[in-house]
Amino acid sequence: MSDQLEKDIEESIANLDYQQNQEHHETEQDKDKEHQDVEKQSSEEETKGIEHVTDSNTDVIGVTKSQDTEEVIENSPVDPQLKEQQESTTKMSLSERDLVDEIDELFTNSTKTVTENNQPSETNKRAYESVETPQELTPNDKRQKLDANTETSVPTELESVNNHNEQSQPIEPTQERQPSTTETTYSISVPVSTANEVERASSSINEQEDLEMIAKQYQQATNLEIERAMEGHGDGGQHFSTQENGQPSGSSLISSIVPSDSELLNTNQAYAAYTSLSSQLEQHTSASAMLSSATLSALPLSIIAPVYLPPRIQLLINTLPTLDNLATQLLRTVATSPYQKIIDLASNPDTSAGATYRDLTSLFEFTKRLYSEDDPFLTVEHIAPGMWKEGEETPSIFKPKQQSIESTLRKVNLATFLAATLGTMEIGFFYLNESFLDVFCPSNNLDPSNALSNLGGYQNGLQSTDSPVGARVGKLLKPQATLYLDLKTQAYISAIEAGERSKEEILEDILPDDLHVYLMSRRNAKLLSPTETDFVWRCKQRKELLLNYTEETPLSEQYDWFTFLRDLFDYVSKNIAYLIWGKMGKTMKNRREDTPHTQELLDNTTGSTQMPNQLSSSSGQASSTPSVVDPNKMLVSEMREANIAVPKPSQRRAWSREEEKALRHALELKGPHWATILELFGQGGKISEALKNRTQVQLKDKARNWKKFFLRSGLEIPSYLRGVTGGVDDGKRKKDNVTKKTAAAPVPNMSEQLQQQQQRQQEKQEKQQQEEQQAQQSEQQQEPQQEQQQEQQQEQQQEQQQEQQQEQQQEQQQEQQQEQQQEQREETQQTEQEQPDQPQEEQQQEKEQPDQQQQEKEQPDQQQPDQQHPDRQQQEQIQQPESSDK
């Protein structure tokens, strides 16, 4: 399409040249007649007409007395030849304007077709400029030839007037030759047609002089044909020939650089001529600019780099909203998901949720590599390399978006840190240790309304901060200090398992002796804060413990990796607003446009969640009932954005110093007897009621946490905590060594850690099975022994029964004997009565009977055979008295 446009323009230029040649030929024929008519006029009339022309040309500011000038022009006679010449000139200008209009129509048609073909409009624009400018200059050159004779005729007329009026006021040649600007010429509004014709003739003369000046300045700027230009400046004819033959094309003239000493910058006339030449190009340039602005308004960006920056920096700045979006998605997953779900997402990429999380992490990592291939954590130097230095004053072009850029960097670095700990991004402990303070201790407080997701492309207000980005870090708080020390410990364990360096070298890198100097330099402070002082002291204690560690339990078991992960993600999920926005993030309000019911529900929800300290009693139930979210009034997207969770029936309540002192005093008095402690310090306690809002479970957990703190810190356990059960080693098993690691101490792989946990569970089950088998075997071995014992017991029981039977028999025998003795006594008495002569024999028998009883007692073994024949004894006893009777 551009070739066809060039052909059309060339044809139109050729037609214009042909018309101008014809008009120039006609003007040459009328030249002689014009001089003759001018000489016939009277000197007075000629003087009045010439004064009117010169006054109209030399008045730069504008003719203030237009009425006087109009009267002079009306009274002055006008030659018909001059009128015809002026009419031909106006016709020529009209034809030129028509040709320019045709070229404009061709250009607009070409731009429409080009935009339909998805081609840039600048190509057609440049083609138009390169072709149109010669078309603009060529008629001007021809006009110089056309007006050359007219210009020479005017001085002759002026000379005749000067000769005729020598006694009157002389007219200097400089005033006669002084041109007037195009703007001044067209600013004169004369209603008479003759005045307009005279002004048009003078404008052609002024335009010729302006073009001569532009050509001369161009030759001086390019340092070409200087001598020739100087000669042309002295000789008018030579100068015209130079203008015809040596004038360059319009495109090169406009695109050339005007030197600082050029007359174009000092002469109003030349500046006006230069402006008139470039006016048509400016029209097309402004039209294309309006078209491009209308197109870009449909393609907004949150942040737009200036067009004069290098293309690479423009790409990095314009891509920040994309990087911010990906980092925000990763952080939302961490903030809204429980710890176990996060571990499952990172360790199970085969599932649908795990594959989605893996793709999101990969996309985030790929986008981040645009900024740096080597450094995992980004700074402002990666966004604008060579322009923006970390810790230095922010460049003025970035100040309107300074807080937006800094908040994006914080999101990206925090998401990178968490992904590295999960093992989804390969980053070693070295980078985590070096960047911990930058990520978890923000210094500047940012406004959440300046987030890239909330900004528009036309918001260019100044965003200032307390200090330059990256100049310093914030204060180290207690939770951050605990995480920092645990991170250093995990880095030491990983480096020791790699086995490439000694303990002393690793500890000197991770826990240096001049750690306090490093903390003060990062914060630009002269003194350490109390938390930092405590942190330095704990680091020294941990260093001695790790250096002299000789216990049988491995360090990887003593300081478990999953315990550190749980503490890390719990802290991030609770303080994610502070990590991104600083202190202003804690009081951040919802700035989105919600439904009418949303704000009321959010106020009720936040009002209930901001009362965690109101507990009813030691039962642990919350006194304030949590608000219920109505799903019929609130949108699902609004509930997700507000992170509304179901409130738990019991809220955690922070321990006060008074409660901690009471618990310590109670442990010193009674030890870990929680019911007794509540009797002394609970509701209606005998000593005080400091623990009236605590339960036995809370007391036990608090005491265990105290004991774990001393164990992890390597400190001596106080006497009042020695009776408390539990410790760091509860529920832990020995872990297998991770595969070979580098000296950079890589972060443990999540899948490997889970496999190790499964192996531990399998080992535990196998041990339980072995114990059960051993128990069964021991039972089987004990069965015969039990049978023997049972037999022995049965025998013993039988013997006891026999003894009891014997005792019973003996008792029966004794009773029988006593009965027999009584009977015998009765019989003896009867016999005594009947036979009184025999008393001596009875006495002897009575004496013999106790002797027999004594013999029976002395010889118990002889009683058994006697018992077997009781009848026999009776017979003997009966026979004895019979014998006595005889």
Swiss-Prot record:
Q: Does the keyword NAD apply?
A: no
Question: Where does this protein reside within or beyond the cell?
Answer: Nucleus; Chromosome, Telomere
Induction context = Expression is under the control of transcription factors SWI4 and SWI6.
Molecular function in Gene Ontology: DNA-binding transcription factor activity; double-stranded telomeric DNA binding; protein homodimerization activity; protein-macromolecule adaptor activity; sequence-specific DNA binding
Q: Which UniProt keywords apply?
A: Cell cycle, Chromosome, Coiled coil, DNA-binding, Nucleus, Telomere, Transcription, Transcription regulation
User: Which residues lie within the region annotated Disordered?
Assistant: 1-208, 231-252, 589-629, 721-886
The residue ranges flagged as biased composition, category Basic and acidic residues, are 22-54, 139-148, 729-739, 761-770, 844-860
One GO cellular component from the entry?
Answer: nucleus
Residue intervals annotated as DNA-binding region are: 674-699
| Listed Pfam families | Myb_DNA-binding, TRF
Compositional bias segments (type: Polar residues): 107-122, 149-206, 601-615
GO BP annotation list: positive regulation of transcription by RNA polymerase II; rRNA transcription; telomere maintenance via telomere lengthening
Annotated Low complexity bias:
616-627, 771-821, 830-842, 875-886
Q: Cite the HTH myb-type domain residue spans from the record.
A: 648-703
Question: Where does the record place a coiled coil?
Answer: 2-41, 747-835
Reported function: Essential transcriptional activator that binds the telomeric double-stranded TTAGGG repeat and negatively regulates telomere length. Involved in the regulation of gene expression. Bind both the promoters of ribosomal protein genes and the rDNA locus and activates transcription at these loci. Recruits FHL1 and IFH1 to promoters.
Q: What is this protein called?
A: Transcription factor TBF1
